């Protein structure tokens, strides 16, 4: 299913800034839903990508990227934010509000997948879910907990992508189609897609 929102009807109408301010994309969502693949895609699109940056440092990074003399790469930032704890996401939501109040142009991408798909991916990769602390939570319990942590952030997303039935290549293609030319356009449309991620 595809839903398209015009500029006046976007779920998040973030303000435009001066030409020296960077274009910022926040990549977040469920662990195992494709955040790393998304980060590599934005690297290919010429973004300077940062993984696991503490929310309290996001505005500092944006300020540095806004300084005169920055090259083109420094004008485009993609920041990956993953599961930590409830306080982490509370800080991230607060930082997004600060960014909007400061007039920073940014978009939030939330990547998701069905619980059964996420469980299968973790079992196939033999990796431990980041919220399976000392194996006190099963994978299913960790995923359920992560959903509760990310619920508010998901509601703030400009783009929601369900990767349950999508291959890594398909995810890359969709992100390129959505962001390769539109990120720098003023008055752009925001398109929300629901897809999937076939093999993790």
Language model segments and positions:
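Extreme N-terminal, non-catalytic leader segments
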Residues: 1-23, 57-67
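Post-Walker A alpha-helix
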Residues: 38-39
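A glycine- and Lys/Arg-enriched "phosphate-lid" helix/loop adjacent to the NTP-binding pocket
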Residues: 104-149, 159, 164-165
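Hydrophobic anchor at the beta1->P-loop junction of P-loop NTPases
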Residues: 27
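C-terminal accessory "lid"/substrate-recognition subdomains
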Residues: 2-10, 141-200
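P-loop (Walker A) phosphate-binding loop of NTP-binding proteins
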Residues: 30
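Conserved nucleotide-sensing/catalytic segment adjacent to the nucleotide-binding pocket
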Residues: 43-97
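Conserved glycine(s) of the Walker
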Residues: 34
């Amino acid at each position: 299913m595809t839903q398209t929102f015009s500029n006046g009807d976007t779920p998040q109408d973030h303000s435009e800034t001066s030409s020296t301010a960077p274009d910022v994309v926040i990549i977040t969502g469920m662990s195992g839903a494709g955040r790393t693949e998304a980060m590599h895609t934005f690297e290919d699109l010429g973004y300077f990508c940062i993984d696991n940056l503490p929310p309290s440092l996001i505005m500092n990074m944006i300020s540095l990227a806004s300084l005169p003399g920055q090259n083109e790469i420094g004008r485009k930032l993609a920041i990956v934010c993953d599961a930590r704890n409830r306080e982490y996401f509370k800080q991230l939501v607060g930082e997004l509000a600060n960014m909007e109040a400061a007039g920073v142009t940014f978009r939030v991408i939330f990547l998701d997948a069905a619980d059964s798909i996420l469980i299968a991916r973790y079992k196939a990769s033999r990796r431990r879910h980041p919220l399976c602390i000392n194996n006190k939570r099963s994978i299913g319990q960790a995923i359920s907990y992560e959903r509760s942590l990310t619920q508010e952030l998901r509601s703030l997303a400009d783009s929601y992508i369900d990767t349950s039935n999508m291959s890594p290549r398909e995810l890359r293609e969709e992100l390129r189609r959505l962001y390769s030319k539109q990120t720098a356009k003023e008055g752009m449309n925001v398109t929300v897609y629901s897809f999937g991620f076939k093999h993790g």
